[in-house]
UniProtKB/Swiss-Prot annotation:
Protein name in the entry: Lon protease
Any single GO CC term annotated in Swiss-Prot or TrEMBL for this entry: cytoplasm
Transmembrane segments: none
Complexes and interactors: Homohexamer. Organized in a ring with a central cavity.
Organism: Vibrio parahaemolyticus serotype O3:K6 (strain RIMD 2210633)
SUPFAM superfamilies hit by this protein: P-loop containing nucleoside triphosphate hydrolases, PUA domain-like, Ribosomal protein S5 domain 2-like
Residues engaged in binding ATP: 355-362
Keyword ATP-binding: yes
Expression induction or repression: By heat shock.
Length: 783
């Protein structure tokens, strides 16, 4: 083919990935795409000329015209070889730059292209710029170390500036866009200046890299020198006899292994690691890992136990001193100790104390440890979301450690402590695993004698540990909950809070705030006032904070006024210390009202009175429900409405009231969400009262779920609800008959002040709650 510079040619185009071919450059290419193979075959049949053009994106499998650069290199095919896998290996030599004017229709890329004319340089100018480029490239080669020196020799034989620029570009580690830019720059001076700028940047980077390598090498030499000197020092000390009395590190570790009395499996594993340590360089990173592993193995208590107390009377005394109430928990601990007296080897119980915040779950764990004579260790599980927190990290990880369980056992030093798993319901899981699943083995008495920590890699016996878990709710995974003996701690009664404050909290805060016992007196009435009007909680944390506030103000008053020798806090002057009352517990209404019923509610901080209001008015049968009611409570209203409709005739209500009356049911404190089925009887009573004009007795409160047949079903939280009724001045409480068995857990002073009436049918409720007997009430099941 005649390569006249002004000539336009029609030529096959071969797209290339990540490669830019320059003139005078010989390069092998591997071609696999069908269109590209067709392109080469056509070129071989004609004049063996092909235009090599780079793709803009290398990952494009089927490039279009827009995916190719406009400027490429016309090359001659020197050799073409078809490979067995269907691909083609071709050897090409770049000839001259060319620019694509437009593409023509074909099975492959066929374009009309035009040769690019490179302007010639002045001989003097060419000599100067060639010399500068070669000198800079020589400096680049010395730092790069990857380009063979022969390349520099070949460059010295090139006088033509354009060819020199292309040769340098072919050996430079440039990005594809930069290589393409070199191809597209027509002016040779500009092309070489661009390359020299690229070389300058690369030289700067290589110099920084060289400095870093030098520092690393120097540091390594320093470490090797220190190791050599340490070994020399040991040899000198040995010759002088200075180390004869000093114990050998390996002998010390072996002695610790012997003294730990670990099981055979653990001993073999530890001694195997000790032998590995002896063969390692003391300064190596692996030696540190092995030494750390051995230290953990000998620090874990394998056989050492604390002596468990078996004196039941003393244990009961300790539990009663530390905590007021909580009889069921104390009873369970004493049962365990009683059995321990008869059986020497008894697996520790796994208890789960479930109750609201502040009722003494965590402090009770410490008291149980004191009563049983066990050492106490606590592990907070709130926010734990990584399985490795329980099972540990495998030793392949850098900085790996045993799980918190083994760490705590190592710290406590005995294998039979009381282990408190605090806030077990606050665990969660993520991509790193589920810690709750890891605890399944720990809390299973049949499996925890062979607990396997990922770090230790041997079984560890946890069967002697007495596990006590605490939780605010029953929101614990089922399999985990099934392994524990759940003991529920309900909120303290007002009487229990009063006794706790008198026995523990007041004395504690008096000492903590620097008061003497004779300088402050807090009367019982003041404590009850704090409980009722300044705190709303199931526990006593808020109560303790308020008592602390009183003590602080008492200290301030005594120091500011020398005439004040002591302070007495009563209900009358409580406001001076704590400010205005923050809460107002529900109280019984003073008069009987139509359509208004007092229900009983359970909350996380105890029980409360729940007022339910109902109004009926002429309308079209619309039922309105307000007061932030949940789905279950709204369904209770629907069920109550059905019960009233089914008994309308017997109750003296027009049977078509649901078509001619609009009814509005409202539960005050609308900003507070309310839900649950236990207000069913109260809803039904309020509807009957509003529709018949029969007032509801103000001294009566009720709780119970209602069915469509009018049966009253059992509810939960009876203790808290009766305490709220007692505190609110209620005289009579109607409860489901099936809840009668729960009355045994109610304090005697509460039962004595309340008339508790178990009921099974809504008819019984209406007869007691309404001021006048409903018309035609019959005590019979509605079949």
């Amino acid at each position: 083919m005649n390569l006249e510079r002004s000539e336009r040619i029609e030529i096959p185009v071969l797209p290339l990935r990540d490669v830019v071919v320059y003139p005078h450059m010989v390069i092998p290419l591997f071609v696999g795409r069908e269109k590209s193979i067709s392109c080469l075959e056509t070129a071989m049949e004609t004049n063996k000329q092909v235009l090599l053009v780079a793709q803009k994106q290398a990952d494009t499998d089927e490039p279009t015209v827009d995916d190719l650069f406009e400027v490429g290199t016309v090359a001659t095919i020197l050799q073409l070889l078809k490979l067995p896998d269907g691909t083609v290996k071709v050897l090409v030599e770049g000839q001259q730059r060319a620019k694509i004017n437009h593409f023509k229709e074909s099975d492959f890329f066929l374009a009309e292209a035009e040769f690019i004319v490179t302007p010639e340089l002045d001989e003097r100018e060419q000599e100067v710029i060639v010399r500068s480029a070669i000198n800079q490239f020589e400096g680049f080669i010395k730092l790069n170390k990857k380009i063979p020196p022969e390349v520099l020799t070949s460059l010295n034989g090139i006088d033509e500036a354009a060819r020199l620029a292309d040769t340098i570009a072919a050996h430079m580690p440039l990005k594809l866009v930069d290589k393409q830019q070199v191809l597209e720059i027509i002016d040779v001076t500009e092309r070489l200046e661009f390359l020299m700028g690229q070389m300058e940047s690369e030289i700067d980077l290589l110099q920084v890299e060289k400095r870093i390598r030098g520092r690393v090498k120097k540091q390594m030499e320093k470490s090797q020198r220190e190791y050599y000197l340490n070994e020399q020092m040991k040899a000198i000390q040995k010759e002088l006899g200075e180390m004869e009395d000093a114990p050998d590190e390996f002998e010390t570790l072996q002695k610790k292994i012997d003294e730990s009395k670990m099981p055979q499996e653990a001993r073999e594993k530890t001694e195997q690691e000790l032998q590995k340590l002896k063969m390692m360089s003391p300064m190596s990173a692996e030696a540190t890992v092995v030494r750390s592993y051995i230290d953990w193995m000998v620090s874990v208590p394998w056989t050492k136990r604390s002596k468990v107390k078996k004196n039941l009377a003393k244990a009961e005394e300790i539990l009663n001193e530390d905590h007021y109430g909580l009889e069921r928990v104390k009873e369970r601990i004493l049962e365990y100790l009683a059995v321990q007296n008869r059986i020497n080897k008894l697996k520790g119980p796994i208890l789960c104390l479930v109750g609201p915040p502040g009722v003494g779950k965590t402090s009770l764990g410490r008291s149980i440890a004191s009563a049983t004579g066990r050492k106490y260790v606590r592990m907070a599980l709130g926010g734990v979301r990584d399985e490795a927190e329980i099972r540990g990290h495998r030793r392949t990880y850098i900085g790996s450690l045993p799980g918190k369980l083994i760490q705590k056992m190592s710290k406590v030093g005995v294998k039979n402590p009381l282990f408190l798993l605090d806030e077990i319901d606050k665990m969660s899981s993520d991509m790193r695993g589920d810690p709750a699943s890891a605890l399944l083995e720990v809390l299973d008495p049949e499996q925890n004698n062979s607990f396997n920590d990922h770090y230790l890699e041997v079984d560890y016996d946890l069967s002697d540990v007495m596990f006590v878990a605490t939780s605010n709710s029953m929101n614990i995974p089922g399999p985990l909950l099934d392994r524990m003996e759940v003991i529920r701690l309900s909120g303290y009664t007002e009487d229990e809070k009063l006794n706790i404050a008198k026995r523990h909290l007041v004395e504690k805060q008096v000492q903590r705030n620097g008061l003497k016992p004779n300088e402050i007196v807090i009367e019982d009435s003041a404590i009850i006032g704090i409980i009722r009007y300044y705190t709303r909680e199931a526990g006593v944390r808020g109560l303790e904070r308020e008592i602390s506030k009183i003590c602080r103000k008492a200290v301030k008053n005594i120091l500011l006024d020398k005439d004040i020798k002591s302070v007495t806090v009563t209900m009358d002057n409580l406001k001076e210390y704590l400010g205005v009352q923050r809460f107002d517990y529900g109280k019984a209404d003073e008069s009987n009202r139509i359509g208004q019923v007092t229900g009983l509610a359970w909350t996380e901080v105890g029980g409360d009175l729940l007022t339910i209001e109902t109004q009926s008015m002429p309308g079209k049968g619309k039922l309105t429900q307000t007061g932030s009611l949940g789905d279950v409570m709204q369904e209770s209203i629907q069920a109550a409405m059905t019960v009233v409709r089914s008994r309308a005739d017997k109750l003296g209500i027009n049977s078509d009231f649901y078509e001619k009356k609009d009814i509005h049911v409202h539960v005050p404190e609308g900003a507070t969400p309310k839900d649950g089925p236990s207000a069913g009887t109260a809803m039904c009573t309020a509807l009957v009262s509003a529709l018949t004009g029969n007032p509801v007795k103000a001294e009566v409160a009720m709780t119970g779920e209602i069915t469509l047949r009018g049966e009253v079903l059992p509810i939960g939280g009876l203790k808290e609800k009766l305490l709220a009724a007692h505190r609110g001045g209620i005289k009579t409480v109607l409860i489901p008959k099936d809840n009668e068995r729960d009355l045994e857990e109610i304090p005697e002073n509460v039962i004595a002040d309340l008339q508790v009436i178990p009921v099974q049918w809504i008819d019984e409720v209406l007869k007691v709650a309404l001021e006048r007997d409903p018309t035609g009430v019959e005590f019979e099941a509605k079949k």
